[in-house]
Swiss-Prot record:
The lineage of its organism: Bacteria, Bacillati, Bacillota, Clostridia, Thermoanaerobacterales. Binds 1 zinc ion per subunit. The keyword Transferase does not apply. Monomer. InterPro entries: DNA_glyclase/AP_lyase_DNA-bd, DNA_glyclase_Znf_dom_DNA_BS, Formamido-pyr_DNA_Glyclase, FPG_cat, MutM-like_N-ter, Ribosomal_uS13-like_H2TH, Znf_DNA_glyclase/AP_lyase, Znf_FPG/IleRS. It comes from Carboxydothermus hydrogenoformans (strain ATCC BAA-161 / DSM 6008 / Z-2901). This is Formamidopyrimidine-DNA glycosylase. A zinc finger (FPG-type) spans 229-263. One of its GO terms (biological process) is base-excision repair.
Length: 263
């Protein structure tokens, strides 16, 4: 699933290509990708509009159009936005094509969970922005009896963290995903804050993690997978303590960690 670093990378690769472009036509081949409005209403509200800004909020991509419309894109598990030359053939997983004149924006999604809407849910602060502070994190941790994995995945607490980066953040901080959030000391909460900032920034620097489906808008893979210490590495030896990494389910998700050095 594209998480904060992947969506940020997609935004950065899309922006130079589509800002200032007009949407001349939209073809929707799978109606369920249009959320909360009909395909006809969606088309009416976007066709003829200019793309004036591209933003990211958590795992969501926001496309601001002239006329004060904003299209919210959620890629979910396997969604992709690809910039292609005009007239490019669609494949069996292409569910929408936006005609931008000399270019096309294709939406592909193997699992068919992603889509477009005009709504944006309420989510927590951006972890790489000034609004996310150690004090904010400590307050949320102290108020929670959930385990740390669940807290990191809760989009209402912190926007944009998914399974891959949650595991890597907890390893960086030396904290067990099973730890109850309220049990963290001041120092441990500080280390978690630093780890969140560090791992997400590295994820963006390396243009995301390409393990299965993720590519950016130019169909290029990321390379953060080369830096993964625990995610997907159950049975391997911990790079920190040389003990065996394990995989368990926490917060309903596969969780990879070192039971020896993550406490």
């Amino acid at each position: 699933m594209p998480e904060l670093p992947e969506v940020e990378t997609i935004k950065r690769t899309l922006a130079p290509k589509i800002l200032g472009k007009t949407i001349y036509r939209v073809e929707v081949y799978l109606p369920k990708i249009i959320k909360n409005v009909s395909v006809e209403e969606f088309t009416r509200r976007v066709v003829g509009k200019e793309i004036v800004a591209l933003k990211r909020r958590g795992k969501y991509l926001l496309i601001d159009l002239s006329g004060k419309e904003t299209v919210t894109v959620h890629l979910r598990m396997t969604g992709k936005l690809l910039i292609l030359p005009k007239g490019s053939p669609k494949d069996k997983h292409t569910h929408a094509i936006f005609d931008l004149g000399d270019l096309e924006l294709h939406f592909n999604d193997i699992r068919q969970f992603g889509g477009f809407s005009f709504e944006m849910p309420e989510i927590g602060p951006e972890p790489l922005e000034d609004e996310f502070t150690p004090e904010y994190l400590k307050t949320k941790l102290k108020a929670s009896q959930k385990n740390l994995k669940a807290v990191l995945l809760d989009q209402k607490i912190i926007a944009g963290i998914g399974n891959i980066y949650a595991d890597e953040i907890l390893f960086e901080a030396g904290l067990s995903p099973k730890r109850i959030a309220a049990s963290l000391s001041e120092d441990e909460a500080e280390e978690l804050f630093k780890a969140i900032r560090k791992i997400l920034a590295l994820g963006i620097e390396y243009r995301g993690t390409s393990i299965r489906d993720y590519v950016d808008a130019e169909n290029q893979q990321g390379s953060f997978q080369r830096l993964l210490k625990v995610y997907g590495k159950n049975g391997s030896l911990c790079v920190r303590c040389n003990n065996v990494l394990i995989r368990e389910r926490h917060a309903g998700r596969s969780t990879h960690y070192c039971p020896h050095c993550q406490k």
